[in-house]
A protein has these predicted regions:
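Catalytic cores of RNA-modifying enzymes
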Residues: 1-179
C-alpha cells in the first residue's frame, strides 16, 4: 500500500513494492498508475483538503494519491475502484482514522446524485473513460465543491481548446464554463 510507513507518511518506495507484486495495469480498464511522489502530492494539493471535507477518489489503484489524501485527514474518505484486485487490496488494509470506505464499483454506473452534502472528488482518470466520467460527475453531483482530475494530454488539449481549433468542441465549452 502506498501511503503509510508506520508514521503515516508518504512512501514512494512502498508503492513500488506493491506494484512489483501486483498484476500489471489493465489496458482494458484504461489503468495507468502514478509512480511519482511529487506529481501525486501536487494533484492532492490542488484539492485543498481540510479536516471537515468529504473526499471521494476514483480508481485508486495502488494508492499513490490515496495515501496522501489519508494523511491530510478528511472527515470522510471514499474510494471507488472497478478493479476487484485493487478494491480488495484497499478494503483489507488497516489504517488509522479516518476510516476509508471502499466501493468495488464502476464509476460510470455510480449514482452521483446520491452523494449528500458537499464533496471533493479526485482521480488520476482511467484513459478510456475520462471524458464521459467528467461529464457525469460535474453534471450529476449535487454539491460538488471541487474536483481535480489528472487526464492524458489529448483530453487536456480538448478541455482547454480555443474556438476555431480542431480540438474545440462541446466538452471544451462545457468544462471551460466551470473554470
Amino acid at each position: 500500500y502506498f501511503g503509510f510507513n508506520g508514521k503515516t507518511s508518504f512512501s514512494l518506495n512502498r508503492v513500488r513494492d506493491v506494484l512489483t507484486a501486483a498484476p500489471r495495469a489493465k489496458k482494458s480498464l484504461g489503468q495507468h498508475f502514478l509512480k511519482d511522489a511529487k506529481t501525486s502530492a501536487r494533484i492532492v494539493d490542488l484539492l485543498r483538503i481540510g479536516p471537515e471535507d468529504r473526499v471521494l477518489e476514483i480508481g485508486p489503484g495502488p494508492g499513490a494519491i490515496t495515501g496522501i489524501i489519508h494523511e491530510r485527514g478528511p472527515a470522510e474518505f471514499r474510494l471507488i475502484e472497478k478493479d476487484s484486485y485493487w478494491a480488495a487490496h484497499h478494503a483489507e488494509l488497516e489504517r488509522p482514522a479516518p476510516a476509508v470506505q471502499v466501493l468495488n464499483a464502476d464509476a460510470l454506473a455510480f449514482p452521483w446524485e446520491s452523494l449528500e452534502g458537499p464533496w471533493k472528488i479526485i482521480s488520476n482518470l482511467p484513459y478510456n473513460v475520462g471524458s464521459p466520467l467528467m461529464w457525469d460527475i460535474v453534471s450529476r453531483t449535487p454539491d460538488l465543491t471541487r474536483a481535480v482530475f489528472m487526464v492524458q494530454k489529448e483530453v487536456a488539449e480538448r478541455l482547454y481548446a480555443k474556438p476555431g481549433t480542431k480540438d474545440y468542441g462541446a466538452l471544451s465549452v462545457w468544462i471551460q464554463s466551470y473554470v
